[in-house]
């Protein structure tokens, strides 16, 4: 079993987006700690299976971030289940988890399931609209969510998601200071080695996604953060 607490860098691939064999090879051979498959819309059983089968040729951890029950399948090392803390719709707090347990509860290996306390911060992102997230958050709001995740819910991961834009470093820093047990994931807008280095100095783990499809060379440079420690 892999130890996710040792992961510093994750590449996130969207099964609804095309990636060439050469680019996928470069991503999987880049020394990233893991590959995560996940997306907001058009995530289907077929495109998840297709992408998973292409990645499974490589000896690195593979994660499915669950966005709908239809695309859940065996064959992943971990299943990340988001609970969107700032969603105004209870379905995104525990609805996916409830349906997953009703459907697969008898066969779930809970050692493979990681619950993420998600906070969506970009109002213009697809995920914010889809989850009906209240993104008008102050630093104090984020600190309170961090305390909630760390001390009350005791979730293993808190994911600060800016999805498409580079986040407010001071707010991410404030969250980090309130997490003593929970692992902090940051994702959103990382498009350069400099940004990756800046966020990796605060978050335990950075998630790099969109830039893969825009500039593969810049995406690969973000892995260099592993050469230094937090």
UniProtKB/Swiss-Prot annotation:
Pathway in which this enzyme or protein is active: Membrane lipid metabolism; glycerophospholipid metabolism
Any GO BP annotation: glycerophospholipid biosynthetic process
Alphabetical UniProt keywords: Lipid biosynthesis, Lipid metabolism, Magnesium, Metal-binding, Phospholipid biosynthesis, Phospholipid metabolism, Transferase
Binding site for sn-glycerol 1-phosphate: 12, 159-164, 189, 209-210
EC number(s) given by UniProt: 2.5.1.n9
Top-level EC class as recorded in UniProt: transferase
GO molecular function: heptaprenylglyceryl phosphate synthase activity; magnesium ion binding
PANTHER family: HEPTAPRENYLGLYCERYL PHOSPHATE SYNTHASE, PTHR40029
Family of this protein: Belongs to the GGGP/HepGP synthase family. Group I subfamily.
Listed name of the protein: Heptaprenylglyceryl phosphate synthase
The species this protein was found in: Staphylococcus aureus (strain JH9)
């Amino acid at each position: 079993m892999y130890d996710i607490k040792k992961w510093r860098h994750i590449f996130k691939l969207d099964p609804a987006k095309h990636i060439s064999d050469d680019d996928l090879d470069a991503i999987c051979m880049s020394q990233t700690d893991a590959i995560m498959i996940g997306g907001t819309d058009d995530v289907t059983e077929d495109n998840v299976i297709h992408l998973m089968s292409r990645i499974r040729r490589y000896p690195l951890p593979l994660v499915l971030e669950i966005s709908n029950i239809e695309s859940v399948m065996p064959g992943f090392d971990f299943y990340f289940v988001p609970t969107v803390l700032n969603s105004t719709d209870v379905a995104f707090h525990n609805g996916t988890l409830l349906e997953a347990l009703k459907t697969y509860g008898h066969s779930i290996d809970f050692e493979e399931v990681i619950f993420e306390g998600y906070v969506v911060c970009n109002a213009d992102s697809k995920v914010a609209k889809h989850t009906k997230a209240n993104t008008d958050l102050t630093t104090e709001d984020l600190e309170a969510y961090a305390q909630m995740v760390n001390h009350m819910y005791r979730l293993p991961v808190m994911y600060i998601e800016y999805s498409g834009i580079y986040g407010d470093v001071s707010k991410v820093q404030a969250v980090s200071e309130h997490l003593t047990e929970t692992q902090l994931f940051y994702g959103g807008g990382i498009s350069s080695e400099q940004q990756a280095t800046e966020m990796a100095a605060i978050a335990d783990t950075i998630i790099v996604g969109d830039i893969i499809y825009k500039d593969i060379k810049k995406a690969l440079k973000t892995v260099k953060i592993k050469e230094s420690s937090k």
